[in-house]
């Protein structure tokens, strides 16, 4: 068992959430490590191929001072899904769990109430081909409006765009309506009500900083000065 993945402390520091991985049923395959071309080493590493068992995953929460683990009752059978991320949902009572089907055609964000043992779907998307998880350019989910909503990057509409999702999953609002990809997300100005991002809606060889209102009631505003064409990066 590998218990070290994706550890997340609750905001109040009282709980620790983590993903437990059991790869004991995953077959091993030989891998050559040619670090020494004269005598290369061969190791056996676990690797799940199509139709063979994948690791079984579960989410646990433990008190920071020790004690028994409280396991989250996920709505799918073990060995049929992946867990991309586990984070605290803007408070110290609920977890936001990102689950992916094994075939990667379904993605869910589940809200798990640790104290009540309840779980609900906050967001779900499907695609007959492939769904990217929240990493790399799609990473950076962030809670806004006192935890009532969160900003999510998704390619559900064919472009990498930003959405505002209500906590109960009943409302979904598209922020970046241009038919172009968000190249990289920037910070969320919660007090000012802005979402910042890098994009190149008119010329793929250029990159500019844009921002848009979190309420979705404005057009994108280019922050990079108009007299500075080219590729821009910001920190």
Where are these regions (language model features)?
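Surface-exposed loop and turn segments in beta-propeller and other repeat-based domains
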Residues: 1, 50, 54-61, 65-79, ...
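N-terminal targeting or regulatory segments adjacent to alpha/beta-hydrolase or S9 domains
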Residues: 14, 19, 60, 187-235
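A short loop-to-beta-strand structural motif that recurs across blades of beta-propeller domains
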Residues: 58-60, 108-110, 161-163, 208-210
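Long hydrophobic segments that form regular secondary structure
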Residues: 64, 68-101
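Repeated scaffold domains used in trafficking and secretory/extracellular systems
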Residues: 84, 136-140, 182-188, 231-235
């Amino acid at each position: 068992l590998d218990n070290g993945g994706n550890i997340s402390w609750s905001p109040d520091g009282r709980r620790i959430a983590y993903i437990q991985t059991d790869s004991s049923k995953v077959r091993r395959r030989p891998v050559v490590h040619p670090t020494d071309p004269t005598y290369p080493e061969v190791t056996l590493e676990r690797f799940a191929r199509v139709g063979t068992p994948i690791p079984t995953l579960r989410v646990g929460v433990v008190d920071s001072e020790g004690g028994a683990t409280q396991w989250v009752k996920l709505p799918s059978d073990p060995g049929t899904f992946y867990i991309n991320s586990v984070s605290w949902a803007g408070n110290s009572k609920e977890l936001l769990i990102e689950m992916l089907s094994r075939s990667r055609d379904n993605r869910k964000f589940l809200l798990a109430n640790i104290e009540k043992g309840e779980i609900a779907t906050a967001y779900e998307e499907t695609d007959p081909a492939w769904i990217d998880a929240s990493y790399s350019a799609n990473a950076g989910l962030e809670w806004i409006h006192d935890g009532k909503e969160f900003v999510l990057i998704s390619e559900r509409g064919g472009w990498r765009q930003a959405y505002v999702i209500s906590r109960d999953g009943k409302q979904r609002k598209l922020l970046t309506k241009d038919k172009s990809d968000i190249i990289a997300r920037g910070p969320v100005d919660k007090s000012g009500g802005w979402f910042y991002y890098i994009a190149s809606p008119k010329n793929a060889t250029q990159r500019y900083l844009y921002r848009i209102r979190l309420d979705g009631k404005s057009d994108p505003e280019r922050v990079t000065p108009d007299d500075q064409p080219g590729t821009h990066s910001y920190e």
